[in-house]
Amino acid sequence: MADEQNLDNRAPEETPAAEGTSAGEDLAARVQALEEQLAAAQDQALRAAAELQNVRRRAEQDVEKAHKFALERFAQDLLGVVDSLERGIELSDPADESIRPMREGMELTLKMFHDVLRRYQLEQLDPHGEPFNPEHHQAMAMEESDSAEPGSVLKVFQKGYLLSGRLLRPAMVVVSKAPTPSNDEQA
C-alpha cells in the first residue's frame, strides 16, 4: 500500500510536469507559427513596396516617352519650315540690295529656329565632305569625283536631324564614287 501511495503521489507530480512540457511545446509551436506569419507578412510588405516603386518608375518612363514622342512629331512638322527658310536664303541673291532686309530677317528667324531646336536637343546633320554613314544619311545619287574620297558626301539636298541622339530625319545626300577610267587611260 505504501508503494501504491508513492505511485499515486508520483503520478500527480509527473502529470503537471508533462502538462507543463506539453504547454511549453505548444507555446514554442505557437511562437514558431507566429514568427513564420511575421516573416511572410514582412516579405509581402517588401514585395508590395518594390512593386509600388516599379509602378512609379514605369509611370515616369511612360510620361517621359509621351513627351519625347509628342516633341518628335512637333519637331518633324517644324523641319519643313526650317528647310523652307534655308532654301529661301540659299536662293536669294546677297548682292541684291532691294531684298537685303528681307534676307537678313530670314537669317535672324532661321538662327532663332536653330537656337530653339538646340534647346530641345535637336541636332542638325550637315554631312558635307564627311564619309557616308547609312545610319544618318540617305543616298539619293552617286557622282564621280576626282576631288573627293570615294564614299564621301559631295552634296546635301536636305539636312538631317537627331533628336536626343536618335535619328529624326536622315540627311539626303549625293555620295562620291571613284571616276571610271577613260578610254585614253586604259590604253
From Swiss-Prot:
Listed GO MF terms:
adenyl-nucleotide exchange factor activity; protein homodimerization activity; protein-folding chaperone binding; unfolded protein binding
According to the record, the residues making up region (Disordered) are 1-25
* Source organism superkingdom: Bacteria
Q: Where does the record say this protein resides?
A: Cytoplasm
GO biological process assignments: protein folding
NCBIfam families given in the database record: PRK14139.1, PRK14140.1, PRK14150.1, PRK14151.1
The record's subunit annotation is: Homodimer.
Annotated HAMAP family: GrpE (MF_01151)
In the record, the note on similarity to other proteins reads: Belongs to the GrpE family.
Instruction: Please identify the protein, giving its name as recorded.
Output: Protein GrpE
Q: What organism does the record attribute this protein to?
A: Azotobacter vinelandii (strain DJ / ATCC BAA-1303)
